[in-house]
Amino acid sequence: MTAGSVCVPQIIPLRVPQPGKANHEIDNNTLLEMKSDTPDVNIYYTLDGSKPEFLKRIGYGENNTFKYIKPITLPDGKIQVKAIAVSKDCRQSGIVTKVFHVDYEPPNIVSPEDNVENVLKDSSRQEFKNGFVGSKLKKKYKNSENQRSWNVNLRKFPESPLEIPAYGGGSGSRPPTRQSQSPGFAHVSGQKCLTSTEIMRIQRETDFLKCAHCLAPRPSDPFARFCQECGSPVPPIFGCRLPPPEGAQMGLCAECRSLVPMNTPICVVCEAPLALQLQPQASLHLKEKVICRACGTGNPAHLRYCVTCEGALPSSQESMCSGDKAPPPPTQKGGTISCYRCGRWNLWEASFCGWCGAMLGIPAGCSVCPKCGASNHLSARFCGSCGICVKSLVKLSLDRSLALAAEEPRPFSESLNIPLPRSDVGTKRDIGTQTVGLFYPSGKLLAKKEQELASQKQRQEKMSDHKPLLTAISPGRGYWRRQLDHISAHLRCYAQNNPEFRALIAEPRMGKLISATVHEDGCEVSIRLNYSQVSNKNLYLNKAVNFSDHLLSSAAEGDGGLCGSRSSWVSDYSQSTSDTIEKIKRIKNFKTKTFQEKKEQLIPENRLLLKEVGPTGEGRVSVIEQLLDEGADPNCCDEDNRPVITVAVMNKHHEAIPVLVQRGADIDQQWGPLRNTALHEATLLGLAGRESTATLLGCNASIQKKNAGGQTAYDLALNTGDDLVTSLFAAKFGQGLEDQLAQTRSLSLDDC
């Protein structure tokens, strides 16, 4: 709200909230009050839905605007009220609109000398009998005590417009000409009692801290269920918990042996169910028992100390309490007094209770309900726990005691021997208890643990092998781990600060690290890392390996030159190819271990890899790459000691062969009693293994490798008689011959 603006007026019906009716549903006897929070303003209103015009003069058209002077009533029907507040300097507020559904009710005549406060007070008393709450209206009228002597004359809708002064003119108004009528607070005698839902709704809308029937303050006990003045039920406070236990509601849990309240479903210490513990476990009853004077617990007669509080029990001669029933009341006639602990009646002159030994005559700060034993206020008329009338019972007990005292007063010469509690009950002893299965650390123990954690953290920080913070300059001097940390940290920082390098390094898919070199030139240190590239395409089917240097050396050393037979060329080519592959493996540091050297256990990744290339798998390249990235071994074997590459060949998953070879799988690994390689198995499959044979030859599988029978894969292809498979080996041999011929031709030209 801006400074200097006028607050909009409020249109408030002056009535008690009616159950089942909305705020806009009123009758023709209900007064409407209009007020604004801005002081010294005039309120103008209309009742036909038109805009209030306070500057319009008489004689210039129809004027339906009225000036508010006192609370008004509305005619029956649907009435739309619009009001505006105007200050003395003609500053206007916003227009507020309210629609009321007005019902017709016959008017109730009230004497003129009754003011609004008396009417409210009388109507509140009548409404409270039926469950209405008027505390909210009392608060509302308390804020306007300066209008205590309101004139409640009814101002009905006038027949002619009200005269309104022009701008800057004097103020004047026509006095009301209607007779006075009473406001609509009359109580209907035939109204039915309210339901609990209606009472809850009225209390939620008005004041839940007061009784809905007698408007008395709510009992101080938040768990009281009945009003202590009228005895009607009091709705519970929202979000209340279990009531606090009384003294007699505490007991020992059978599981943890802790003194816990017994009015809860489970033990608050060990969470054991208490319902089963409260049921009697046997039908045996004590024939004789001794009541403890300290806590009032019944104990077996042969015990000397109480089983509950461990206090000394009176001897059998002193105790007159045996059996399950209380001893008879004293036979002497006269006044009696009730014990506040066990409820037994004792003589007026008794200092202690003859049943439980409690001291009598202690002024109680609260009254105890004789039915449920709950504590109530001294002035309470009804019990807040069970709802019975406490005043009447107390009065009856007092009348009875007075009648007995008046009938035959007790002579003072008579004496009554009542066992008093001895001061020297026994020597005090320190008894230690132990809770089995439970441990509660103390504050000292927790502080000690915190100190140990802090000292351990300090020791770890001071350790020599603790990872230090990275610096701008690497340490050098043989600290290769710190050097690698320095390289990785600065490489990450460089990638974060250079988008171009970040985009380039994020694109390729890299495998294992093949080689790494370090070069120093005095100013800079160059580090080169070579990784194997991974792609979904088959990069090994048509890959030609340049073995010119090795073939050249073999051709120069040969005595027959080009005049040798085809078999000699094939053997030379195969031997040179195998030597070259071994050298490449040594350069790339492929450390392959055969099954005879080390038998590895199948880890989950290896098991999934064998399943993917097995008969039930699909041989998906992406899945195989993911498993290899997660740590699967490309040289693992199944239960039959077959390498994974051989399993892929036998199950016709030729797409997985290049991926396994790239990740370090031994392509010439032998298995079984026949010592066959993957190329042998692919050749034995015939046409079904033609694609696997071509893939293995493209990955430089050894043709010269022999099995246990002394046969190469080419020999097996010739035995099967499959021309398509044999042509693959011939193409491989032809490529080798062409390379050797080209190398020999270049040597002869150099000699010339």
Swiss-Prot record:
<keyword id="KW-0677">Repeat</keyword>
<feature type="repeat" description="ANK 2">
    <location>
        <begin position="640"/>
        <end position="669"/>
    </location>
</feature>
<dbReference type="InterPro" id="IPR026876">
    <property type="entry name" value="Fn3_assoc_repeat"/>
</dbReference>
<dbReference type="GO" id="GO:0005737">
    <property type="term" value="C:cytoplasm"/>
</dbReference>
<dbReference type="GO" id="GO:0005813">
    <property type="term" value="C:centrosome"/>
</dbReference>
<keyword id="KW-0597">Phosphoprotein</keyword>
<feature type="repeat" description="ANK 1">
    <location>
        <begin position="605"/>
        <end position="636"/>
    </location>
</feature>
<keyword id="KW-0963">Cytoplasm</keyword>
<dbReference type="GO" id="GO:0042462">
    <property type="term" value="P:eye photoreceptor cell development"/>
</dbReference>
<dbReference type="GO" id="GO:0042995">
    <property type="term" value="C:cell projection"/>
</dbReference>
<dbReference type="InterPro" id="IPR002110">
    <property type="entry name" value="Ankyrin_rpt"/>
</dbReference>
<keyword id="KW-0040">ANK repeat</keyword>
<protein>
    <recommendedName>
        <fullName>Double zinc ribbon and ankyrin repeat-containing protein 1</fullName>
    </recommendedName>
</protein>
<feature type="modified residue" description="Phosphoserine">
    <location>
        <position position="182"/>
    </location>
</feature>
<dbReference type="GO" id="GO:0008270">
    <property type="term" value="F:zinc ion binding"/>
</dbReference>
<dbReference type="Pfam" id="PF13287">
    <property type="entry name" value="Fn3_assoc"/>
</dbReference>
<dbReference type="InterPro" id="IPR036770">
    <property type="entry name" value="Ankyrin_rpt-contain_sf"/>
</dbReference>
<dbReference type="InterPro" id="IPR025874">
    <property type="entry name" value="DZR"/>
</dbReference>
<keyword id="KW-0206">Cytoskeleton</keyword>
<feature type="zinc finger region" description="DZANK-type 2">
    <location>
        <begin position="339"/>
        <end position="387"/>
    </location>
</feature>
<keyword id="KW-0863">Zinc-finger</keyword>
<dbReference type="Pfam" id="PF12773">
    <property type="entry name" value="DZR"/>
</dbReference>
<feature type="region of interest" description="Disordered">
    <location>
        <begin position="164"/>
        <end position="187"/>
    </location>
</feature>
<keyword id="KW-0862">Zinc</keyword>
<feature type="compositionally biased region" description="Polar residues">
    <location>
        <begin position="174"/>
        <end position="183"/>
    </location>
</feature>
<feature type="zinc finger region" description="DZANK-type 1">
    <location>
        <begin position="211"/>
        <end position="270"/>
    </location>
</feature>
<feature type="modified residue" description="Phosphoserine">
    <location>
        <position position="160"/>
    </location>
</feature>
<dbReference type="Pfam" id="PF12796">
    <property type="entry name" value="Ank_2"/>
</dbReference>
<keyword id="KW-0479">Metal-binding</keyword>
<dbReference type="InterPro" id="IPR052481">
    <property type="entry name" value="DZAN1"/>
</dbReference>
<comment type="function">
    <text>Involved in vesicle transport in photoreceptor cells.</text>
</comment>
<comment type="subunit">
    <text>Interacts with NINL isoform 2. Associates with DYNC1H1 and multiple dynein intermediate and light chains as well as actin-binding proteins.</text>
</comment>
<keyword id="KW-0966">Cell projection</keyword>
